């Protein structure tokens, strides 16, 4: 992935994962990539990859089960559609 210089890398990677949630690559209740998998796929630092998961959790798109990993929230597709609609309305 080629990163845009003016946007934090964690936000760019989060956008990719968000798109994958939206297109069904990661359906509700499915596991999302671990921090280490994000590091391997995108070539970013571990701390940056951890920010990806924190950001997606804050948006309500993923949740974590201790010892199990992070998963797509059942409400994630609806939340993404609402956020995109709000962006269009605001723009």
Question: Predicted regions span which residues?
Answer:
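Extreme N-terminal segment that seeds HTH/winged-HTH DNA-binding domains in transcriptional regulators
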Residues: 1-44, 54, 63, 74-91
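Short Lys/Arg-enriched helix C-cap and helix-to-coil transition segments
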Residues: 63-65, 69
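DNA major-groove recognition helix of helix-turn-helix/homeodomain DNA-binding modules
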Residues: 59
């Amino acid at each position: 992935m080629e990163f845009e210089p003016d946007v934090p890398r964690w936000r760019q990677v989060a956008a990719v994962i968000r798109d994958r949630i939206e297109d069904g690559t990661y359906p509700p209740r499915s596991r999302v990539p671990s921090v280490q998998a994000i590091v391997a796929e995108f070539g970013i630092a571990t701390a940056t990859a951890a920010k990806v998961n924190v950001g997606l959790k804050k948006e309500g798109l993923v949740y974590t089960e201790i010892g199990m990993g992070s998963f797509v929230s059942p409400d994630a597709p609806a939340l993404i559609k609402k956020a995109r609609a709000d962006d269009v309305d605001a723009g």
